[in-house]
Amino acid sequence: MFSSRWKKELGFGWNWIYNSEIIQSVSDNPEGPYQFLRVILPRRGRAYFDGMNTHNTCIRYFNGKFYLYYMGTSYGGEIPQGEETSPERNLEVWNRKRIGVAVADSIYGEFVRRERPLLSPRDCSHWDCTITTNPAVAILPGGKTYLVYKSRCAVGEPLMLGVAVAEQPDGVFQRLSDEPILSFDDPDFHVEDPFLWYDAERKKFCLLAKDDSKNGSRGITGEWGSGFYAESDDCLHFEISDAPKVYSRYLNWKDGHQTRQGNMERPWILFDDTGKPDYLFCASGTGENPYSFQGRTFIVAQKMCLK
């Protein structure tokens, strides 16, 4: 498993853009427990776009190599040590999020990073002029690679998803369209945390993403923070399912009790040996209110039931 972490004593706050690092853990089965193995992408210096912080992993395999896609940031000034950071500084660093890739010959080998982002924001005439983040990748059998990413045009504007394509997994990526892949008439319909895969049998691009609706909007699913499903023939024109909700913030545990989680972030699917979705993983934590974690955060694994 590839995930991200930072020191518990720092609290949650905005440390996912200041103090996060990507790690690797191992387990004998999908449900765990997982044992920490090593840090994959530590800090490497302020001169790099990802030199101070790495987060939001997406691991893929193709033709003998492992491709680890991620979001990175760099920033000047002091490294936050648990104190509250100003909204102005948070926004400055948030706007420096960029997608990168690191490549290894073995899942246990050295992951080598690029010096430059895999995909950068465009100029201010476009909807994705602020950031590129939350990478979701599908590699087709011939190596053609589709990259779904999150961005927005300004503070308070809708979070939306775009798509870029390359002839090989490490680029060069070019956007498929000037417009986002999902857009809504209601400005309170925000989407983020995509997970993308290609169903070769059905020749469909499949998308799982988080309903991040704002201002009390019912959003796509009717439940903030839940996940919805959409699919496409070309990874550009997506149709949201008639029954879109894939997962909820309500969890039913093996001992029979139910909890409402504050967050279910960064959905990730593990496939079985036949290529069918098997387990859904999400980042979560203790506490019922969004982003108000009480004590600890963790990763949840849920066995999937296909309909």
Language-model segment annotations:
Residues 1-307:
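Carbohydrate-active catalytic/glycan-binding domains of CAZyme proteins
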